[in-house]
């Protein structure tokens, strides 16, 4: 059972796409000692807005405080908490090519991924799944001695 005082939370923030907005949001977290586990930012197509997805840890009370503080920032238009969201995370993993090439391909397919590049000595796979399943993929991938694993931040969308 997760510790509700330090539970993983995802907050999605819709902001005006202008300079210094990201700095103001990260400063809000830093000034209060809140940790950001993952941060992704992307413009919203056909608008002057951006979508910021922040993964952090904390209690329900702490998340309420963060949400209230975010609402006070002028370029923030909407704040959505993780219960209302579908989350995905992406991973790129590089493996040495060996006799287990098929196993690596099957493993990545089991986690909504596949082979994205094959070189003479290396294979690169991409996996995109829920954060818990990404953690399991990374654990399972260790048996194939990955040379490198790069995790992207969480992206989320309201249900």
State where each predicted segment sits.
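Long, contiguous binding/interaction regions
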Residues: 1-10, 14-49, 55-159
